[in-house]
């Protein structure tokens, strides 16, 4: 079943491209990029109502895990 989002592909792509551009501008290596994005994620989740944090964290981890390509030939 396809995932339906309340955001347009354009909104998503624009924001993602802006974030990637900033990381590239700073020549951030993978580990630094992941550290920063992880902290941003934590700050966003901690800004939510406490009752929602655990559930959204579990959904986020599940989505991240399922979206990672585990094939060895990706790059």
Swiss-Prot record:
Name this polypeptide is given: UPF0352 protein ASA_2693
Superkingdom per UniProt: Bacteria
Lineage of the organism: Bacteria, Pseudomonadati, Pseudomonadota, Gammaproteobacteria, Aeromonadales
InterPro entries associated with the record: UPF0352, YejL_sf
Pfam families: DUF1414
Family: Belongs to the UPF0352 family.
Coiled coil feature spans: none
Gene3D superfamilies on file: YejL-like
């Amino acid at each position: 079943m396809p995932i339906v989002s309340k955001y347009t592909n354009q909104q998503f792509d624009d924001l993602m491209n802006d974030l990637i551009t900033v990381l590239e501008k700073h020549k951030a290596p993978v580990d630094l990029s992941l550290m920063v994005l992880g902290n941003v994620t934590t700050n966003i989740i901690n800004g939510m109502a406490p009752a929602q944090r655990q559930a959204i964290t579990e959904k986020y981890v599940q989505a991240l895990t399922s979206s990672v390509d585990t094939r060895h030939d990706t790059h």
